[in-house]
């Protein structure tokens, strides 16, 4: 067994060592070296700005609700029929629309003899359609950020199902998928809602991203006071993407705290276009763009310009602090 000397000098090293003790006790000595290396790497990355791109999913990255690309058909219903029944449950019980659709999925799958295990949700997720350019989008933006000295991270903040999103072709692109999910029994089958995310619950994940907290369960660290300089992703470094009015609380918070909110819309659906224009007119978002994520799109142009602005402001602030 080797000994560990935590008595380094310097404010930064003391901070590293404070975290190191915790990591050592949690991980054990064999994993300690890897853990402390990762910690030092994270602190090093803070020398360059981290920009968080946070996306709603349904209607934002995909042209429809994820349940409409295989699951609803598998239970023998039409999308309109399924959502009407879900709304009736919510209205009749004065219940959450999110918990109502999760219950309906569970009940209808059981009637149809369909098992709902993680792998089953992922299989349905693999059929979810995406807007033009979405698959290539992450590589394009990551590369642009790298060329500007910026680290880009991607997050999902959705009222859809995390398990289905995990089955999509783009799941690996996200640092964290914040979304609804089920609790599973010993046989691996869904038996109860584990996380339900409605339009106001979404806002908590902005503050978790802000402080670098990836756990859904955590309700302590996210509420602890933290100096602005220590927050992993400042709000001005956030870009929020959403298609509708259910994302308004998140869009408004990000915009209010100096970040940028983008209302994306399907140009083929007039109602979606009108909603986006309304949000811009009401100053709830900074920009509106068609749901096109190709390199030639307005979305790409807007996001690259925001990244440029973030980097310039970051460099100016650092110069102002230097002697």
Residue ranges and their predicted role:
Residues 7-10, 35:
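Short, low-complexity, intrinsically disordered N-terminal modules
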Residues 5, 13, 22-25, 42:
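Intrinsic-disorder-associated, low-complexity terminal segments enriched in Asp/Asn/His/Tyr and depleted
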Residues 20, 35-38:
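Ala/Thr-enriched low-complexity intrinsically disordered regions
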Residues 30-33:
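Short linear segments in intrinsically disordered or otherwise low-structure-confidence regions
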Residues 125-155, 159-323:
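C-terminal cap/substrate-recognition subdomain and adjoining C-terminal extension
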Residues 37-186, 279, 283-287:
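Alpha-helical substrate-recognition element adjacent to the catalytic core
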